């Protein structure tokens, strides 16, 4: 019994492999394009053209996804712009206040 190796040693003490696992594969259409060339797009007149334009707007790389939030369900939601508050613009209603006080 002392010469046998415990099952927990076989499970937890394995050496890690030096080669990393491939998490995803690059599709052939993207592998063939070089540099900043745009990937081929589907027909603009197709039924999903509205969806594709919205998706391109969301995935626009110039904004780096700062205006997009991913919900717990995995859907992309666009963040709404926050309006300026009175603390940021204290002189916003000064003209209106002066008009009332002169009456």
UniProtKB/Swiss-Prot annotation:
Pfam families: ATAD4 (PF15321)
Recorded family membership: Belongs to the PRR15 family.
InterPro entries in UniProt: PRR15
Compositional bias annotation for Basic and acidic residues: 53-63, 93-103
Tree of life domain: Eukaryota
The protein's name in its UniProt record: Proline-rich protein 15-like protein
Location of the region described as Disordered in the Swiss-Prot/TrEMBL record: 28-103
